[in-house]
Amino acid sequence: MKILGKYKGKLGEIAIWESEQTGDRYYREGEVFQSQSSASGESRFPYVKMMEAFLGDTNSVLLLGCGGGNLATMLARQGKSVTVVDHNPVSFDLAKRFFGLPKEVPCFVADFKEYLLAETRSFDGIAIDVGGPGFCFEEQFDPATCHSIIARLKPSGCAILNMLVATDFDAAPDMISSDLSEGHMTSWIFDHPGRLNRNVLIACLPKLRRAANRHYMAKFSKTVGCGWTLRRPRRPSRGSTSSVVDIACMS
């Protein structure tokens, strides 16, 4: 591995690494690898590829969170209209310089919650992949923020959120999923039960398309990698004690 550059980020030092064996590139902020991709920007993370697949039928997509910009790059290359928001301006420069993010993709430097409140456009899809050292998902995705996300979707729109979960005892995915299911949306959780410090995806679709949603989720579930499970959220109240998450494996 060799270091292509080091930069000052808002949450710690950002380092860009490159594998001399494979050519893959890595975006590391603080102690966390935010992105891993080919030199052309194709993500190596399974969850990013799942987010890309989930947004396959969309035309306009709002991405909250940049990192190496892999998801934005992959969607833009499909001809989608992509808008990216991140609080760290250096992320956009690094995504374009090292990870192939097209220069024409609109990038906005802003706190994602403030951006949602100010934005007036509606989108076919919204993807959320934010985080970093000290980030608390339960605090950041409170009911008001979840409402702001859904408010920026078209009536037929969909949303998908990536979050980090420490253990099966973490109730945050269920709380956030329940809040995202208010109003006209419904949600599912993709998880890796039993793993520590894992990625969890929350996928949201319009409630009124129940039959179409079941068909879509069943079809989408068959495309995901080994080990992922699909379930509906439980409804713990905020402030409740954590409980073991009941997971049902996909067939």
Listing of model-derived features with the role each one plays in the protein:
Residues 1-41, 49, 194-251:
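SAM/dcSAM-binding transferase cores
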Residues 17, 106-108, 188-190:
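General small-molecule cofactor/ligand-binding pocket signal
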Residues 6, 42-152, 158, 168-177, ...:
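The AdoMet/dcAdoMet-binding core of the Class I SAM-like
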Residues 184-195:
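Conserved S-adenosyl-L-methionine
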